[in-house]
């Protein structure tokens, strides 16, 4: 409720100068509801304007379940098919979007979202509307530089040249620079790798605990390794770092250490489940929901108690769903 009032006070508006997307534009949407005719969505770059993905435009292949293709709450990249600005109808397609299109649109949306967040913050700070700041500064920068984020990046080094001719005060210019510098600061990446570790021998849980402990011990000043229980024998190795390659290498090293150690015990074995992934957004939320069922790895025996069969099957289904969605994304 508070967020809605803030948006109203700021007069929140679209990212770009044009009021409607154009035919053949790639845009980012959020799925609101699914009905017989299709999926109704909010167009995120155009102030949550409503559009519809027709059922015939969901997939090139036949499908039995709509939920396997699209889900309420998910973000999707779609192509604009038709725009009726008078009636406000916007028809969209998901099936005509290629993997390259998705990457291209996600990169553009990420850049535009950074700019929009900066605009909202600065507008609130100076008591003006988002649209007013867009009209005076941001939209002219889009026209001049192709993308306002590229302009603001250059402004951090050459502000006089970039802001020349814009009808904004020095205070607003300084606020724009201060905010965008913070948003351009490299953010730590979160990576995770799923593993199965078990021991049917005499040492059992103690062997698993020892192997996981060895895996955690490879942490250093640059990369910290955490290992958490999903449901026996499933565990997840998680790390956070600025260097993706370094983080992936460290998780692989932890996996090798764990594998080597558990195999020293009779009946002990190790299996990697899937690839090492960068997590964030919806994927991070799904992982947190899974981990909420169990505590992280510690010296307590409770962390290694076997869940009942229903809990284990439920966790496996959640993980499989997560992988399906990652492939769709």
Swiss-Prot record:
Coiled coil: none annotated. One of its GO terms (biological process) is regulation of translation. It comes from the Eukaryota. The modification Phosphoserine is found at residue 59. Residues 298-329 have a biased composition (Acidic residues). The keyword Oxidoreductase does not apply. The keyword Transcription regulation does not apply. Residues 291-329 are annotated as: Disordered. Phosphorylated at Ser-59 by eIK1 in response to amino acid starvation. Phosphorylates at Ser-59 in schizonts and gametocytes but not in rings and young trophozoites. Phosphorylates at Ser-59 by eIK2 in salivary gland sporozoites but not in midgut and hemocoel sporozoites. Dephosphorylated at Ser-59 by UIS2. Phosphorylation of eIF2alpha subunit of the pre-initiation complex eIF2 inhibits recycling of inactive eIF2-GDP to active eIF2-GTP by limiting the activity of the guanine nucleotide exchange factor eIF2B and thus, inhibits protein translation. Changing residue 59 to A: Loss of phosphorylation by eIK1. Loss of interaction with phosphatase IUS2. Its main location: cytoplasm. GO terms for molecular function: ribosome binding; RNA binding; translation initiation factor activity. Residues 24-95 form the S1 motif domain. InterPro entries: NA-bd_OB-fold, S1_domain, S1_IF2_alpha, TIF2_asu_C, TIF2_asu_middle_sf, TIF_2_asu. GO terms for cellular component: cytoplasmic stress granule; eukaryotic 48S preinitiation complex; eukaryotic translation initiation factor 2 complex. Keywords: Cytoplasm, Initiation factor, Phosphoprotein, Protein biosynthesis, RNA-binding, Translation regulation. It is found in: Cytoplasm, Stress granule. Belongs to the eIF-2-alpha family. Functions in the early steps of protein synthesis by forming a ternary complex with GTP and initiator tRNA. May regulate protein translation in response to amino acid starvation. May regulate protein at various stages of parasite development. This is Eukaryotic translation initiation factor 2 subunit 1. It comes from Plasmodium falciparum (isolate 3D7).
């Amino acid at each position: 409720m508070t967020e809605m009032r803030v948006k109203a006070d700021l007069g929140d508006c679209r990212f770009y100068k044009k009021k409607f997307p154009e035919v053949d534009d790639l845009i980012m949407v959020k799925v609101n509801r699914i009905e017989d005719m299709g999926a109704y969505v909010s167009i995120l770059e155009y102030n949550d304007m409503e559009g519809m993905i027709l059922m015939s435009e969901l997939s090139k292949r036949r499908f039995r379940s709509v939920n396997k293709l699209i889900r309420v709450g998910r973000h999707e990249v779609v192509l604009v098919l038709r725009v009726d600005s008078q009636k406000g109808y916007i028809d969209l397609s998901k099936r005509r979007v290629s993997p390259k299109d998705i990457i291209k649109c996600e990169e553009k949306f990420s850049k535009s979202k950074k700019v929009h967040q900066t605009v909202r913050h600065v507008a609130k700070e100076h008591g003006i509307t988002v649209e007013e700041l867009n009209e005076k500064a941001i939209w002219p920068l889009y026209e001049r530089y192709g993308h306002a984020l590229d302009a603001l990046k250059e402004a951090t080094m050459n502000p006089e040249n970039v802001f020349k001719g814009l009808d904004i005060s020095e205070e607003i210019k300084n606020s724009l620079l201060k905010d965008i510098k913070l948003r351009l600061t490299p953010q730590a990446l979160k990576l995770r790798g799923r593993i199965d570790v078990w021991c049917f021998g005499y040492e059992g849980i103690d062997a698993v605990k020892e192997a996981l402990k060895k895996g955690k011990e490879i942490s250093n000043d640059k990369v910290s390794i955490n290992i958490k229980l999903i449901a026996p024998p499933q565990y997840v190795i998680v790390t956070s770092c600025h260097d993706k390659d370094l983080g992936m290498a460290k998780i692989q090293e932890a996996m090798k250490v764990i594998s080597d150690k558990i195999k020293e015990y009779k009946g002990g074995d190790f299996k990697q489940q899937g690839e090492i992934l960068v997590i964030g957004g919806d994927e991070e939320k799904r992982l947190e929901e899974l981990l909420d069922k169990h505590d992280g790895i510690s010296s307590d025996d409770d962390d290694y108690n076997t869940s009942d069969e229903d809990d284990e099957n439920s966790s496996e289904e959640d993980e499989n769903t997560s992988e399906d969605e990652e492939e769709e994304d």
